[in-house]
Amino acid sequence: GHINGQVEEVYGGHNIVKAFNKEEDVIREFDETNDILFRSAWKSQFLSGMMMPIMQFVGNLGYVGVSILGGYLAIKQTIEVGDIQSFIQYVRSFTQPIQQVAQVANMLQSTAAASERVFEFLDEKEEDQFAENPVSVEGLQGNVEFEHVHFGYNPEHIIINDFSAKVKEGQKIAIVGPTGAGKTTMIKLLMRFYDVNSGAIKIDGHNIKDFNRSELRQMFGMVLQDTWLFSGSIEDNIKYGKLDATHEEVVAAAKAAHVHRFVQTLPSGYNMILNEEASNVSQGQKQLLTIARAILADPKILILDEATSSVDTRTEVQIQKAMDNLMKGRTSFVIAHRLSTIRDADLILVMKDGDIIEQGNHEELLEKNGFYAELYNSQFENATSCA
């Protein structure tokens, strides 16, 4: 398992390995891992190979013992020759199961290495997909409330402390802060990828734990920091959030995400097949395709996590206009480090060390001259100096 993981890792990042001239280091690490595998496999195969001969030798010793002892007793006229033959048959019936056990032991030994990971996976606690007396998502407007939320991936280390906020239907909420402040974690809690340690998250007054997970997540459309596209046609990837969408709807979503013109330049258009890692399109184009997928899904709540971090400035402006149209009348959460993209947000939540230290719109936060103003001015100064 370790050597397979190492090979897969190096294969996936072979360009980085070559760029840093680490081929010899990678080969050396592979040889070390392979030597460990060879030594353990050699011992395993040696013991497995010796098991059957040893069992057969033990069985043959039984025949020899019966023959010698039986011959001696026959000479003494203690038993008959027929009794000796009977004992030989009994020995065969006794040794045959032992040999079968040895064969099974070889099979168990060969699967022992994999069983540890398999049972580790099976022992993982499954998500509770269904709630008792679940609340229907039909008719929900998209009002979101965080009530004194506490959370930590490790209960002994809480990273989000007493998080509280109210978001009204149709508002655009921006969450900003330094790396590790807890911005992305809040989104994962909202969609119940994790459950809060204490407190509650509510949608239209209903605790999100009262919804079935699948129905809850149907309310959300996501554009993640790490784009994900599967091996298949471009149209199938865009339709992932709405499998029954027509081709015309796919094209409309692509136009709204400003990716339609790019798709038209491809030899097969929307039927072009993306490879396993979608490496036959650029990172910016992958970002646009995921935005088109979110537009087509038409969610009630939209989540953008660094949505425009991998595209050029011109494309970013186009995407921002398209997303502004999409977010009208729809509750939207935007996570971004470039504060220039969220100046029009209805509410900006400034997070630091898991806590909301400031909140308000862009102008209000600048007037406070606090942490947000410090972040914004530092980015503006950096942009000016680079220009």
Predicted regions and their residues:
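An intracellular "coupling" helix at the cytosolic face of ABC transporter transmembrane type-1 domains
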Residues: 2-9, 15-61, 107-110, 127, ...
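ABC-type nucleotide-binding domain
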Residues: 123, 130-131, 137-387
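Transmembrane helix-loop junction
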Residues: 18-19, 72, 76, 265, ...
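Helix-loop-helix
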Residues: 43-117, 121-122
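Conserved catalytic Walker-motif region of ABC-type ATPase nucleotide-binding domains
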Residues: 30, 118, 146-148
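Conserved catalytic core of Hanks-type protein kinase domains
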Residues: 10, 20, 121, 265
